[in-house]
Amino acid sequence: MGSGGEGLAKRDFLQITDFSRKEIEQLFDLAKRMKARQYRDTPLSGKTLAMIFAKSSTRTRVSFEVGAYQLGGQALFLSSKDIQIGRGEPIPDTARVLSRYVDGIMIRTYDHAEVEELARFATIPVINGLTDLTHPCQVLADIFTVKEQLGGWEGKRIAWVGDGNNMANAWLEAATVLGFELRLACPEMFEPNIAKYEAAKKTGCVMVTEVPEEAVEGAHVVNTDVWASMGQEAEAEARRNAFKGFTVDRDLMKLADPKAIFLHCLPAHRGEEVTADVIDGPQSRVWDEAENRLHVQKALLATLMS
């Protein structure tokens, strides 16, 4: 049952900058123990996570639902069509009501302002499962994968090739907190959020270019995402034209460090943002990356909801 009482102390996770470097490192230590099956606690016993989906998903839904179950709790799937928020009920009302019923909320939606409003009025933890602005849970899992595969992010160059979308913005948030080198290659008019970029420049070594080769040169991690995200289907053809030359292929990967790894948050469109021989090749770590969503989010749930 939810905490119910107004004003009780709680912690939300809406963007990566909500956590300090030390907190992220502690989260990763816990996720590592969970992945190694060295963690046997059930901190979510008797607790329920409400999962609100305005955007459909495979990895977000399954990883959070399985994660809650493995921690002793349960997850309640709520599509926007199933609850009154989809019919115009004010978000503050939904936040207050859910706070009386459940112990945490994960929301995956379009408008980031909706997540902020939900968190402002909920008295239980709110987790951003994705918005059009940022995708913090995914990038946490990506950085955990970098640490797992390469030993850490210190001294590593991370490259992003493609749309300056919510994933690129979340990488900028991570660079703000962790201070690693980040190079983003995006076509003109598809650059990342300017506020995220300016914040990252203050603490990290960050560059935005229109030339993919500049971003990938010497990189230890090469990242990309689909060119047209969910809700942008009408723009797909125009985006394909705009992103010509931004495909991560074998020739582009040759410019990276010889031991570089390739990451993609999935779903992937082979032949568009990445070629099959890269995403299915020996440098790809996308399946480890996808698995790590489960472990990192379990650590997040245990931290926020226990």
PLM region descriptions:
Residues A54-V66, E148-T224:
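Glycine-rich phosphate/diphosphate-binding loop of Rossmann-like nucleotide-binding domains
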Residues K201-D277:
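Rossmann-like adenosine-cofactor binding region
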Residues L71, Y101, F121-A122, L178, ...:
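Short, structured coil segments at secondary-structure junctions
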Residues K259-A260, C265-S306:
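Adenosine-phosphate binding glycine-rich loop
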Residues Q38, T42-K147, R270:
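Phosphate/diphosphate ligand-binding glycine-rich loop within oxidoreductases
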Residues L44-L49, E154-K156, K259:
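Phosphate-coordination loops involved in phosphoryl transfer and adenosine-cofactor binding
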Residues G2-V62, V66:
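Positively charged, low-complexity intrinsically disordered leader regions
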